[in-house]
Amino acid sequence: MRKFTTILAVLCVALGFACCSTSDSEESVAKQYIDATFTVELSDLGTRSAGKATMIDKVEYGIYDVADGGRLLAPISSKELGAIDFDESKAVIDVRLAAGKKYDLVFFAYSSKSNAYSVDWENRLLNVSYKNTATGKNDLANLESRDAFFHVEQDFLASTGKTFVLNRPLAQLNAGQSYSDFANMLGNKIIKSSLTTQAYTQMSLGRDTYGNVLGSKSDVVFELNDVVDVDDTEGNDDLVVKVADAEGNAVDTPYKHLSMNYLLVNSKELVNVEITMLGDEGTLFTRNYPNIPLERNYRTNIIGNLISSPFEFEIVVNPIFTNDHNQAQK
């Protein structure tokens, strides 16, 4: 009986040690990882009107191990590497990351209603198509769904509570008709427009090269489509441009939207632009604008009496932001 008691005591001690060892091991492993939560938001947080990120509803992200040659990691938690719904231009992402390690994070936000963009996550490349991939034909003009945003964060140390602001890799090109010109049309209005210009089809998302476009510009044709405010009678979808008044102050000035399109450009570009506009009486108006400046994450606005005085127009480039994040990546 005494011998049995001794064996039982030793067994209990051994089991207790094993339990403690398992607990310590689990605690040690837990300390090696951080359950990181960070927020992704869009830089364009203004009113939800045309040209204001109204259709962005998905964000994809890639996580790369810097110490392991930038290797793309497999999904790290219950959330898969893929699309997460946006809510009020924000998305919250939860991932488990190793404590003390550096990561590169790549985010790309887009509209689920467009197939204009694809990301090669292994090679960290953004590919842009100006065709309708379903039909193989040129895409339509004035599609808000072609809007997109990105951000690359290098050498991120696992932490929580971080907010990343995404900016457009695109320039927004607009044409706006003055209200006096609109009045001169005596009730007629422009209902459709098309665009012919040049833009790039690929951009790097790579380490130290992100934001660099690749290759040469390609010809881009966006086919005739409804203008963004064709059914608007209250001015809600006006093109609002900051124009200098007589004292040199920038004043918000409304124009009738005739054209709005997104183009992948280098940090700054000069392109030739042709806009064809269809009036509701069936008349076509074609306007050519040479050497128009485009700038990534900015709005280039061609404004004036574009119908009655085709050779009298103004080019105004406004920052695309409505908040304090007034810096485009590269």
Language model regions located:
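Extracytoplasmic cysteine-anchoring/structural motifs
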Residues: 20-330
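Bacterial Sec-dependent N-terminal signal peptides
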Residues: 1-31
